[in-house]
Amino acid sequence: MPMNDTFRWIVVVFLATHIPATIMMDSQALVPAKFVPKFARSLLEFHVNANHDPLMEFQPVWFKSLIAFELVFQLPFFFVGCYAFYHKRNWIRLPGIVYGTHTATTLIPILADILHSGDIPSAAARAQLFFIYLPYLVIPAMIAVVLCANDQPFGAQGNAPAKRAKARRRGFLPVKTA
């Protein structure tokens, strides 16, 4: 069964918005401050103060290791994933499963830390921060589940390369027959 179009668009928007968030916010756990634009440092400071985020404030080593993986592997996937989900390409299935399972798995210790951190001043602040991070568990987990459940998540048309399929629709290439 092909992927629901609403979910496909949720994934495209999720991945597209994750690009600036990763570059401007998350990368600050590893990139020296002198290389980070002032507006991005201010944005992170605002987030830490408004949401009482001890992970971005104190940046423990285990958290930095997850950010390193995000920068090296997930950031490129965001671009590739946006393209593939937007253009309905079935070849994204395996990379999407890997991305979804890895990302969902990394959110377990992050959410556990938020739930048990002594650095968050109140239950309301803890809940607020928990719900800020929760979509980064739920959406990747849903991506993995949906892609695991479908050999061809975008149906048969998801197998054709974009340029060849477009040329074929316009009559420039012959249609293959069995």
Regions found by a protein language model. Name each.
Residues 5-36:
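N-terminal signal-anchor transmembrane alpha helix
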Residues 12-24, 72-76, 97-109, 131-145:
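Hydrophobic alpha-helical cores of multi-pass transmembrane domains in eukaryotic membrane proteins
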Residues 30-50, 154-162:
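Interhelical loop segments of eukaryotic multi-pass membrane proteins
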Residues 49-72:
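Interfacial helix-start motif at the membrane-water boundary
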Residues 78-93:
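Juxtamembrane helix-break-helix junctions at the cytosolic face
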Residues 110-120:
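Juxtamembrane "helix-exit" motif on the non-cytosolic side of transmembrane helices
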Residues 119-132:
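Non-cytosolic membrane-interface motifs at loop->transmembrane helix junctions
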Residues 156-178:
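Non-transmembrane, juxtamembrane loop and terminal tail segments
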